[in-house]
Amino acid sequence: MKKWAIGFAVLGGFVGANAVTWNPVCETNGHTLVLSSDHFEICRKAKYDDGSTNNVGVSRDEAQKGLDILESVFVFYHDSLQWMLPQPGDPDNKLKVAVYVFDDEKMGALYGGDNTEACNEAGCSPGIWLGKGSLSDRSGLAHEYAHGMQSLTGWMGNNSHTGWVCESHANWMMHQFIPNEAPGCSEYLIDFPFLYYGSTRDRYCNWHFMEHLKEEFGGGIEGVKEVNRIWTESIKDGEAGRMEQTPFSAMMMVYDWTLDSLNQQFGKFAMKQATLEYTPAKKKLYKKAWGDYEFSTRRSVGVGYPYSNHARITMMNKIPCPDQAPGEGVEEECPDQYITPSYWAPQRWGYNLVRIYPDKAGKVTVKFRGIVQDKPTVKGYTCFGDNEDDYLGKKYKWCNYAPDALPDPASGWTVGLVAEGSDGTPRYSEMKHGKGFNLEIETKDNDKALWLAVTATPTEMQTIMWDQFYYSIYRYPYMIEVVNGTPEGYNKDFWKPANTSGYKQHSNGGGWVSNKASVASTVFVGPNAVVNGGTLTGKARIEDFAVVDGGTVSGNAVLRGRAFMSAGSVSDDAVLEEDAWLVSGSISGNAKVGALSVIFESTIKDDAEVYGVMWPLEYKTISGTAQLRGDLENNFSKEISKGIFYGMVDDGMLNNANYGANLTTPPTEATASLDLARWYAVADDSTDLDSSTTAIGLLQQVRPMGTSEPKLYFDKKEQAVFIRYKKNGREFRYRVTGRKN
């Protein structure tokens, strides 16, 4: 795949740190100087912002430790990386960076940003504010000083567009400073890769794409310098266009990229994520820090945040065969085709990894069909936002939560296959961009895994704002068909217990039931369902690929889809469905839990519903008619009994109509329903006939709906003549002559 050729420019405005005079700030502004170094001052203000007295005591050793860390950060950021110095407008005289120290009880965290008191103007000097315990926090100081430097560029734009990148980039800079550590939350992007890139939900933890760009630009110090150009060479404070600037438009401007160039980079990034294909040292570090993609890992406590690994790899849903049309000859089965669950489909520049299990070594072909959405489902929503700007005489009010207008979806995907060799080295297929196409790759008997990497790459820029509600953001679902392979979950005996000793097939449904479980004869256990433990009574139903490891299921409760139950209880008429997981707690009444929800020590009852795609719901009670949906960040402590909430939810939102407190039905989603999705032919189909097949008449490209003209062909392997045609977007073939094996 093509590597982007980018010239390495020396950053404008950089002057060696030792060539200038660094002047004090702390005592000049009436504060108490604790200790000073070449470029920093540990400073104690007399009062907190609330007017109370700041009595913090800082020993010389504590202050010196903080200064030593900060000076090492300074040398790395400025001397090694040549990031611009503070007060970029004055190359000869600089101000020391003030580090304001407070008592830990009043300020337990660290903050970095613009210190306007240093030079009586914004964008002049960085500052750091912290509790004294943070003076020894190496990673925290590196992160906050990066914020201080970002402030000198005007934060790249307004918070609605760029707030997330400030946190992401600061953690990435911290990672450059401490390269043998992966910042603590960095597995979040691995856990929830389908969220749009730049999501507010994982803003501290989604810096992986910057590491990818660093390596695209040659790696090492030069690669870091190239990434930092988006801060130093993008539209500056005071220049026209800054309010509309996003980190992505900045990249396109600085690197002279088109949207297609950016889309290709995100496609390459997703393929790289399949094997974490960074430099050898980073690959080893990341695999140790983030764990693997195995199904057993995803259904365990996992790594990082507990029970958050289960959504890493997308599992497809099989498309039911349509009603077969009458015709002469022997009717053949319809092709095995699969569709993404809507909740698992990637948002803009999010990606899915789908594991493919080859039937045998050799060529595997994946037929990819994006589900094209031509227009929004709604024109927009009632504008709701909390960010405003006044810039160059113009006032900006951002609808950052609920946009009042939606762009066209501009459906597009960038897709590739990655075969992971026996030694972990990847082999890549061609990477394709568009709506529908076929991909192929050669596999080997000793390959570790085969991955399909699907990135949502719309053909028009999609700008998503800070905390924008989940329902207003497009997802980009798709369908696949695999030749010589099967998506995970549909390969032979995937759900069957590895050792059926101690199991029997249940009399009511035929599913596998362990002798460690107690299952009443009135309970239905479907043929693909498994009960490894627990007590199941009444008219409960365990359907599809649902698995019960423990707990109690009673009444008319239903588990279906790929629902997983470790413990707890599901009772009455409650439903656990789709890819939801009950780790512990209870679901009762008419409650429903689905999508990618994880329930841990929580109570879901009455008519409540939880359909989340992100964080586990822990120690919560959801009752009445309340609903939680989408990219949940559950920061509330009170019981919720009404309303429908998305995204970050805290106690202050529970009675606020703007956040959903008065909703009784979910808002219309921007993403169209999958009900009308139909398979369709593409130009690649005419070149994908098996070598044992001789074409007599090739299928023409057909509309997604309707029936194509029948064509005859002779299959050498089958020694038979078939009629092939398309109906309702699906392919059918009928045997006219020859043997039937």
Labelled PLM ranges:
Residues 20-125, 129-145, 149-153, 400-426, ...:
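Zn2+-dependent metallopeptidase catalytic core
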Residues 237-494:
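Beta/coil-rich, acidic/histidine-enriched accessory regions frequently appended to metallopeptidases
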Residues 556, 562-564, 575, 579, ...:
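Predominantly polar beta-repeat domains that present long G/T/S/D/N-rich surfaces used to bind, process
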Residues 116-121, 135-140, 155-218, 228-273, ...:
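Acidic/His/Gly-enriched intrinsically disordered linker/tail segments
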